[in-house]
């Protein structure tokens, strides 16, 4: 008689994905972030569902409905802050997950990598439309500025913007449709995450050495279930510390002022996790050029499998490429800082240099470092 988990049609799928999955024996803590992203997604869907029960997507009542959630709903303040800070946590895990993929050459699993990029785009879209919903000052003006960027598209730009707005400005219809998008997108993300896993399990996981580990794989359970559980506990401790002690640390004070189309905030800026892209957008004086740079700053990740020049997969034994990688991380931190600063000297030139450096490292310097290291292997 076979074990039920191996014979039952539903249990069999779970078994192949999370129990008997052959896993490399040497994957480090950096491989925990995939499961942590799953945890973040579940957390966001659950808290979002409870918020949607009390939220109203109408310009006259949206702001007061969020206030009502925080003041009158049982533990509404907790659900609201868990959802708001959960987005930040999601992006922290997401950026570390992408960074690990770049460092250890996981992008060579092209299908998994490309679906990951699509997931990143969808997550960014979800976060953007979600940020508009509380209908505070920064929500309204953020929506106005970012949707207006589409008007840079030749011929159809202006029509496209008005079609998305549902009128001639960001108004009631915009808020209603953004709420609809914000509700449906996480479920599309969940479905795509399953496809992401499906493609990953076709090839098996990469490992820190970047070499095949078929000869020494171990079952996922109990080794990596316990390891993922430890990661989840540590992450939740960090998360609840943020939610309970510093709930507004990552938010914008302007969002505690109701949206007013007649009063523009002095500095319009997105949440911290979009600041690097916002800095790249602002560093180009031309509107269409800025929009193209903004999109390409994420799309450039899709070129990584084709820019891989090294004979080795991982950066573990490639000091020159490691230097380039950490220069890229430092550059992204600088871009994030610049994105939050006003458009004035010296921030303008710093942003422009950092933007050029960002594309140079990915498109030129890292492939060159790979070629130099190939030469060094022959010495």
From Swiss-Prot:
Q: What pairs make up the disulfide bonds?
A: none
Q: Which residues bind heme b b562?
A: 83, 182
GO CC terms for this protein? mitochondrial inner membrane; respiratory chain complex III
Give GO terms for biological process: mitochondrial electron transport, ubiquinol to cytochrome c
- Please provide an example of a Pfam family that matches this protein in its UniProt record: Cytochrome_B
Keyword Heme belongs to the record: yes
Q: Which GO terms describe its molecular function?
A: metal ion binding; ubiquinol-cytochrome-c reductase activity
Cross-referenced PROSITE patterns: CYTB_CTER (PS51003), CYTB_NTER (PS51002)
Entry keyword set: Electron transport, Heme, Iron, Membrane, Metal-binding, Mitochondrion, Mitochondrion inner membrane, Respiratory chain, Transmembrane, Transmembrane helix, Transport, Ubiquinone
Subunit notes for this chain?
Answer: The cytochrome bc1 complex contains 11 subunits: 3 respiratory subunits (MT-CYB, CYC1 and UQCRFS1), 2 core proteins (UQCRC1 and UQCRC2) and 6 low-molecular weight proteins (UQCRH/QCR6, UQCRB/QCR7, UQCRQ/QCR8, UQCR10/QCR9, UQCR11/QCR10 and a cleavage product of UQCRFS1). This cytochrome bc1 complex then forms a dimer.
Q: Any other comment in the entry?
A: Heme 1 (or BL or b562) is low-potential and absorbs at about 562 nm, and heme 2 (or BH or b566) is high-potential and absorbs at about 566 nm.
Q: Which family does it belong to?
A: Belongs to the cytochrome b family.
Purpose of the protein: Component of the ubiquinol-cytochrome c reductase complex (complex III or cytochrome b-c1 complex) that is part of the mitochondrial respiratory chain. The b-c1 complex mediates electron transfer from ubiquinol to cytochrome c. Contributes to the generation of a proton gradient across the mitochondrial membrane that is then used for ATP synthesis.
Name listed for the protein in its UniProt record = Cytochrome b
